[in-house]
Amino acid sequence: MNMPLLDIQPRTLQFAVDLKKQTSCVVQLTNTTHHYVAFKVKTTSPKKYCVRPNVGVVAPKSTCEFTVIMQAFKEPPPDMVCKDKFLIQSTAVSAETTDEDITASMFSKAEGKHIEENKLRVTLVPPSDSPELSPINTPKQGAVFEDSILKDRLYSQSETLAPPQYEGEIVKEPRMVGHDELKAADNAKELKTPKMATVDFVEDRYTANDLKATKDSYDSSRMAKETGFDPIRSHKDADDGRAIKATTNLDAPMKKAMDLPRDQGFTNGIAVDSEPKISKERDVVQLQKTDGQNVRGLDELKLVKDIEEMKLKVDALESKLKQADSTISKLMEERSISSQHRQSLQHELAELRTKKIVKEVHNGFPLLYVCVVAFIAYVIGHFLRT
């Protein structure tokens, strides 16, 4: 396999140094082969970065993306030099392989597999060099407004577009557009307003699903009183000479973005659609619920297995107890039999002893018998002599 398995873009990960805020970088993997390719991402500082997802399978001639999130800096670094690196390991796998089937052994070189490794460097850039959205009044994203169409949806504040938000990423606060920037934009290009105006924006930067016009109607004087913004003149209407006013205040905090419908015109405030964020939050909640259900199911399965194992152990103990009872009863019977046999032996031994004593007594004549016989013989002899 001389041809590389994956084409990785970018080769250098750039992170903006921003205190107390997370920054992220998206890496795109392109499978240039006709095989399914599994990849795994490693880093030299796992506590500092979060990779989502860190493993995956890329289909032939397709692309896959993963996001690298850098944790927020607690204090500014002394220099902008970063020695952290990322290692992307990739290998060809079968078409049936899923993300759950990927293990560390798949990327082991001991089995003789072809493992491709690509290293990515990390560079730190100041926050000013990080990509930010341009003001809404620039010529590239300028829009033509019709006062007769937008008079009921006029806002008295100017807003900028927020950058797209990835999962687990903290989005930076949008930057307010000041008087100087608006004047410079007006001097650079004067916007003429026909009666039926449309909104022109760059499609390659933001799609139609990301931008919406407002549905609600606000009073411009009321909003100006509440926010305290200074009014600035932007464009004049060709018919009745009325000007669309947009206000901004560099010291005031940014309000939340306006929710604008697709089929209507824009006022001076344009905001990113919140539906993807809500859908992502719903997906996260659903994933958490499914994870909780899976965890509960696994816990229940473990509990059932433990109960079955306990039942098997109890049955084994009961069988052992029965065997012990049977052996104890056998031993008791043997003990009673042995005691009876012992008693019989003792009785026989006593009988043998009594028989031996009787035999010993009957050997010879008794002393009384001898005395009587001697006395009778003496009497008979005395009478015979006389």
Curated annotation (Swiss-Prot):
The modification N-acetylmethionine is found at residue 1. The keyword ATP-binding does not apply. Keywords: Acetylation, Coiled coil, Endoplasmic reticulum, Host-virus interaction, Membrane, Phosphoprotein, Transmembrane, Transmembrane helix. Gene3D superfamilies: Immunoglobulins (2.60.40.10). It is a single-pass type IV membrane protein. Residues 5-125 form the MSP domain. This is Vesicle-associated protein 2-2. Interacts with cowpea mosaic virus (CPMV) NTP-binding protein (NTB). It comes from Arabidopsis thaliana (Mouse-ear cress). May play a role in vesicle trafficking. The lineage of its organism: Eukaryota, Viridiplantae, Streptophyta, Embryophyta, Tracheophyta.
